[in-house]
Amino acid sequence: MAFVPPQAGYDRAITVFSPDGRLFQVNYAREAVKRGATAVGVKCNEGVVLAVEKRITSRLIEPESYEKIFQIDDHIAAASSGIIADARVLVNRARLEAQIHRLTYGEPAPLAVIVKKICDLKQMHTQYGGVRPFGAALLMAGVNEKPELYETDPSGAYFAWKAVAIGSGRNTAMAIFEEKYKDDMSLEEAIKLAIFALAKTMEKPSAENIEVAIITVKDKKFRKLSREEIEKYLNEVMKEVEEEEVKEKEEDYSELDSHY
């Protein structure tokens, strides 16, 4: 008879807690997100920004076909990390809920309502047999009365953020946000911060493998930045990084001079 580890029963069944209160399949779904491409979101007074790493593994892939930021409604967008197919199901459900709300009430859906609907669906997939948790997390951004930014977890939990990152580069990006985020930053500064944080998590950042979208308070419309716009912001950000590195080196040398 083969040896069966003590936790195997809790490991296989989505509806059974382990003795220490964990649902292993939910934890594994989170691991799928941690291994996914990095996605970041930044909120400011003028709007909200989403930026995502596009992991293009072959030069034969058409970059435009590799979509990681999705329009949910005119005023709502989502960026994904984790299993893309799972994210697509969640995005389609969010689009459906947004249109149902618009047809029922004659007004754009509040972002918080859509986020709750999606997280209710995620939570259901942690509670019933015959299903598995969604191996994807979404950053959901939008503008109703004001800019809003939410992170949705595979467990069904959701949180509102000023700036947040998901995916493999989460720790690096969050450290940058903790240091550089300002409540009074402009939309352009928010775009630069999002691209800077994302670029720091990538080996070779370029306009081709970065996707950026914005929703402004002024028009409440979703818009993706063109490759030329992304390249302009990326060049400005990388130039600032190089200047900072040179300044740090000069400071280091000045400290050495004090020993003579």
From Swiss-Prot:
Record text on activity regulation: The formation of the proteasomal ATPase PAN-20S proteasome complex, via the docking of the C-termini of PAN into the intersubunit pockets in the alpha-rings, triggers opening of the gate for substrate entry. Interconversion between the open-gate and close-gate conformations leads to a dynamic regulation of the 20S proteasome proteolysis activity.
Gene Ontology MF: a single term: threonine-type endopeptidase activity
Family the entry assigns: Belongs to the peptidase T1A family.
One cellular-component annotation, GO: cytoplasm
PANTHER family (UniProt xref): PROTEASOME SUBUNIT ALPHA/BETA
Location of this chain's protein in the cell: Cytoplasm
InterPro entries: Ntn_hydrolases_N, Proteasome_alpha, Proteasome_alpha-type, Proteasome_asu_arc, Proteasome_asu_N, Proteasome_sua/b
Complex and partners: The 20S proteasome core is composed of 14 alpha and 14 beta subunits that assemble into four stacked heptameric rings, resulting in a barrel-shaped structure. The two inner rings, each composed of seven catalytic beta subunits, are sandwiched by two outer rings, each composed of seven alpha subunits. The catalytic chamber with the active sites is on the inside of the barrel. Has a gated structure, the ends of the cylinder being occluded by the N-termini of the alpha-subunits. Is capped at one or both ends by the proteasome regulatory ATPase, PAN.
Name under which the protein is recorded: Proteasome subunit alpha
Ranges where the record places region Disordered: 241-260
Matching CDD domains: proteasome_alpha_archeal (cd03756)
GO biological process assignments: proteasomal protein catabolic process; ubiquitin-dependent protein catabolic process
UniProt xrefs under HAMAP family: Proteasome_A_A
TM segment ranges: none
UniProt keyword annotations, A-Z: Cytoplasm, Proteasome
Protein purpose: Component of the proteasome core, a large protease complex with broad specificity involved in protein degradation.
Short name of one Pfam family: Proteasome_A_N
Main location: cytoplasm
